[in-house]
Amino acid sequence: MSRFFRGGDDSSTDSSSEEEEVYTSEEEEEKVQAEDESSSEEESDEEESDEESSSDEEEGTKKKGASRFLQSDDESEEEEEEQSDDEATTKVKSAKDKRFDELESTISQIQNGQKINDWSLIANEFDKLNRQVVKLQDGSKAPKSYIKAIADLEDFMNETLAKQKVTPKKMNATNARGLNAVKQRIRKNNKEYQTQIDAYRKDADAFMESDDEVAAPKVVSKVRFEAPVVSAEQQEEDDKGFSTVDSRGKVVQYTPESILKHLRAIIESRGKKNTDRLEQIKVMETLNKVVPITPYQKIRVLQTLISARFDLGAGGAAQMPLDQWKAAERDLASLLEILEKEKDHVVVEGAEEWDDDDKLPTIPEGEKYLKVPGSVVSLIERLDDELTRSLQAIDPHTSEYIDRLTDEGSLYNTIFRGLLYYEHLRKDASLEVPQESLNRIIQRRLDHVYYKPAQVVKILEENAWKQVSAEADSEITPRSQSGDAGKLINILSNYLFENSEGIIRARAMLCQIYFLALHDEYYKSRDLMLTSHLQETIANFDIATQILYNRTLVQVGLCAFRKGLVYDAQNTLQEICGSGRQKELLAQGVMIQRYSQVTPEQERLEKQRQLPFHMHINLELLECVYLTCSMLLEIPLLAQTGSSPDVKKRIISKTYRRMLEYHERQIFTGPPENTRDHVMQASKALAAGEWKKATDFIHSIKIWDLMPNTEGIKTMLAKQIQEEGLRTYLFTYAPFYDTLAIATLSSMFELDSRKVSAVVSKMISHEELAAALDQVTETVIFRKGVELSRLQSLALTLSDKASSLIETNERTLEQKTQGSANAFSRKDNRGGGQRGGGQRGGRGGARTGGNPQRQAGGTQFTGGALGNAVRG
């Protein structure tokens, strides 16, 4: 039949053919605009198939044109029969259905790739999937099968990455490239569908069974309209005349009588699945504005509201949102303000819960207070912890970190008001407020001031006292003593030391020592550290306290260096700086160790323990101080070992020795570039007696500018280098002098004659120098024969090594022949193992006696001609 004589049913086929033509043109345009290079081959295949299909359609339309009127009657009848048979058996699919079939096929290919762990296949199919879903977003709706596929693929990718961290087996190169490609693309892609993905992960069955499709964001938006900024007051005015309804469509009314019921429902739903926390916060903010509201209701609403805000920072969230933190800080300040005004309402931990939501509680007979269950100190601690987490996550080199750090002032005011409130509660013994609560809040206050300079602490205290009324005062830290930071730290530390035990007591002591060392009170801080005996028990404390101990130890060492006590500074810093793990021990960074198996949980805990940047101790300055002290001690010691074998094995700093040996092995040494190079070249100059050159190298280190009183420190270092240069010179050249005038040494090292005499006298009294000081002629008279020559010292070295070789061989032989009765006997009964008497053949000399004792000093190589030469 001709198409001009068809009935009304043909309109559907015409519309479907028009859809196919539009689909073909849209496909061709999109394929021309495709940007992914990896899919060029696939697109070319699709274009070829589209061209073939379009050519078939054109041929069909031509046949349906003029040529079909030239057909015979028989042909037309046969064709009508074939068409009727095809219509009875063939199901015509629309273009949209075809696209859905292609989408499902691609998803199944991705699932097959997941089963065989073929990430190259997954990467290609994932790109193809994203191109296909663009064509299906006609009404800005993403198919649920697509949402399910990308969510499952992201979970599978995270599992694969986690397995790769803990398993030593690596992927091949192709698979690894595919995994990296998927990791880069899927995170960027899934951000556009995060709402649908979250809904799917909360309840997959409900998401897939729901009728309405979740709207997906448009991939390409040509025109963007920005929503006008609406203030809170304007939004409230716009909402007038409207009522809030619940999920069942009933109007929700917030009245003073229903506040406790709403709070009960919110508290019971906390922690449950699919709970909208932001909606709960909005409800409680509305309850907080209900008028009239009693103090009890206000306290209950604020407690629940603050806890709900903290829930936003719990779980997998990196940190609490900034606006919620500031809102929680304001709510906590409002809570403390209410408790300060309403003296008959108290928040204590041991109070009973009020169960009757239909009526308000009253003060029981015979009591003065209405007790509300809760803990103010726990809220303050959580607020403090959230600020620390936020500072850990912010880049410290940005202005955002400085802006966030300003919130510490308002937090300190809240801690101070909380301390005043707990002091008020402790006055009444009937409330039975535990001492531990007061200790915890004092410890938080101490944690915020112990590492700050006295001027900053003074400003914090002044601002805190301005926030409270003029009549308010503290028994622990009176208002009259708020101007002296040293007294404040001393009072807080002594209070905790007397009224607490365990970790809090140890932390209080360490905070006081840190503050004293920071303000150049070296001898006080050293005596407190020694009398506390914390170095003996610190291993039994938690990791946070051990970190504080390490920080305090470093600060004491830096204080000793500023005082010019080089030996004390080096000994104090040796434990931390000699390990090479300063970052880890001071909680200022995570050390990436080779071949270490660190679980994700351990890595997360390690990052949580890191200190915020403003609390860090400069590691470059610390290394510079340690290496400088080691140089001033090691260079004279190395010069002394050249002529005195008794001190040969004494090493003050192994770290410094390794650096010095590595520097000496360098064929060419360029100008110093960093702190370590400056110290190494200064060491080389000092060992050669060029103390002026060594001083110039040390003074040119720019890190000294970070220390207070920079010029005083440089002057102190110059004097130390002069004295140690004098000692090094005497150790090196003593064997070549008979007498040496004090005036000569004074002019060489530009030291006062009295200072030179004092240094020489100290060396003689410590038996470091075999000489005598003639005060009449002001000369140093050296004794000959005491110091060994170079040949004698080398001969002793050879004898020591030969002796140790013999002992090692004998021990090895005894271990190999252990248990054998006649291990050392020979056929002619001459054996080295028969030590009960007799002679040893062929080993030079005889040994008599049953079991002769070894000579002291370890140099007992006495056999053969070499032994006789050494003895002679």
UniProtKB/Swiss-Prot annotation:
InterPro entries, A to Z: EIF3C (IPR027516), EIF3C_N_dom (IPR008905), PCI_dom (IPR000717), WH-like_DNA-bd_sf (IPR036388), WH_DNA-bd_sf (IPR036390)
Domain PCI, chain residue ranges per copy: 613-787
Domain of life: Eukaryota
Official protein name in the record: Eukaryotic translation initiation factor 3 subunit C
Key words, A-Z: Cytoplasm, Initiation factor, Protein biosynthesis
A Gene Ontology molecular function term of the record: RNA binding
Ranges of compositional bias, category Gly residues: 831-848
Assembly mode: Component of the eukaryotic translation initiation factor 3 (eIF-3) complex.
Bias (Acidic residues): 16-59, 72-87
PANTHER family: EUKARYOTIC TRANSLATION INITATION FACTOR 3, SUBUNIT 8 EIF3S8 -RELATED (PTHR13937), EUKARYOTIC TRANSLATION INITIATION FACTOR 3 SUBUNIT C-RELATED (PTHR13937:SF0)
Keyword Protein biosynthesis: yes
